[in-house]
From Swiss-Prot:
This is Ribosome maturation factor RimP. GO terms for biological process: ribosomal small subunit assembly; translation. Belongs to the RimP family. It is found in: Cytoplasm. It comes from Neisseria gonorrhoeae (strain NCCP11945). Pfam families: DUF150_C, RimP_N. SUPFAM superfamilies: YhbC-like, C-terminal domain (SSF74942), YhbC-like, N-terminal domain (SSF75420).
Amino acid sequence: MYIGSSMDIQTILEKTLPGLGYELVDFELAAQGTLRVFIDKEGGITVEDCATVSNHLSRVFMVEDIGYKNLEISSPGLDRPLKKAADFVRFAGQNAKIKTRLPIGGQKNFIGKIEGCENDTVTVSFDGKTVQIELGNIDKARLRPEFKF
């Protein structure tokens, strides 16, 4: 059972992880008391990174009285979620799948290349077209890695 809201947890994670050298990618409160935290850093995440963050967060959550049954620390994976403007800037030139809250030109799902992000507007090119999507209109966005064999 959780003691504290998801906003409390997010605030704690956003204050703690950068001091350890990690970026908070996302977190989720899963069934049966599991708290999953997805972290990243330049060069990727190792098992040792996950252990370091787990040990540190366990202590922080104990002090802050945040209860959970299981704490899982993980990398976001190759298809990591994109949530902030900085994510779209960092991954410009890569492919992504974006689902919007409201349709743009009668379409809510876009798969294309991230061209960039300025003034909280993401530019994506697909099928020879370019579309601009306001961050506030993005419901979900994930990198879509290309595998070349």
